[in-house]
Amino acid sequence: MSEATTTLDGWYCLHDLRSIDWAAWKTLSSDERGQAVSEFLNVVEKWNDVAATKKGSHAMYTVVGQKADIMLMILRPTMEELNEIETELNKTTLAEYMVPAYSYVSVVELSNYLPADEDPYQNPQILARLYPELPKANHICFYPMDKRRQGDDNWYMLPMEERKKMMYSHSKIGRQYAGKVRQVISGSVGFDDFEWGVTLFADDVLQFKKLIYEMRFDEVSARYGEFGTFFVGNILPDEKVEKFLHI
C-alpha cells in the first residue's frame, strides 16, 4: 500500500452559492426590499466583527454566468460555526428570495512535507496559510477537483517520493504567479463530492485562465487531474450590496 500524505488542517470552509429569484424579489415594495437588505448587511457586519478578531474570514462575490448570482466563502474554526452561519442566513428575509445553486464544504489544507523535527504549527508562514485572511481581490475563481484513480493512472497507488516530485514541479508553476494570484486549497475527502476545493483570487481575471491553462500541461493535471464545475465572479463590497439588489 502506498504511504498517505500527512496534511495540516486549518479553518473549516463553506462555499455557499445562491441565485436570486428576481421575479419574486420585484414583488416586494421598495421599503420591504430595503429592510431585507439591511437585515442581510447586519449579518455581514457580524462576519466583519469576527474577521477583525482574526477568528475567521469571509469573501462575497457576484457570479458571472447563469450558474449562480452570488458566492459567499466563509472560514471558521469549527464546522458548527459554519452551520450556524448558514442557518442564520437562511432565516433572513433575503434568503426567501434566494435559490440554492451550489455549496461546498471543506477545510483549509496544506501537505506536510516539512522536516520531522519541525512543528509546522509554530511556523508563522504556515499559520497564515492555514488561517488566512481572505483578500479583497477584484475576482474569484472556485472549482472542486479529484486525483484520478483509473487503471495505470491511479494517483493513490504511486509511491510517496514520486508524488512529492510531481507536486513540487506542479507547485513551481503556481509560484510563478505569486503576486498575481492568491490560492487557497481546501481538503474535502469525506466532506463533499470531490477531494479538494481550489479558490483563486486575482485583481486581473485573465490570470486565472493563464495559470490554469499552463498547469494543464503539467503531468499532475494532464494525467491525474479531474475537475468539477468552475465558478468565476467579481467582488461585491458591503457598500455595493444595496445597488446589486436594487430594482
From Swiss-Prot:
It catalyses: Fe-coproporphyrin III + 2 H2O2 + 2 H(+) = heme b + 2 CO2 + 4 H2O; Fe-coproporphyrin III + H2O2 + H(+) = harderoheme III + CO2 + 2 H2O; harderoheme III + H2O2 + H(+) = heme b + CO2 + 2 H2O. It is an enzyme of class 1 (oxidoreductase). Fe-coproporphyrin III binds at R129, Y143, P144, M145, D146, K147, H170, Q183, S221. Its cofactor is Fe-coproporphyrin III. Pfam families: Chlor_dismutase. Keywords: Heme, Heme biosynthesis, Iron, Metal-binding, Oxidoreductase. The keyword Iron applies. GO terms for biological process: heme B biosynthetic process. The active site is at Y143. The keyword Oxidoreductase applies. Belongs to the ChdC family. Type 1 subfamily. NCBIfam families: PRK12276.1. HAMAP family: Coproheme_decarbox_1. This is Coproheme decarboxylase. It comes from Bacillus cereus (strain ATCC 10987 / NRS 248).
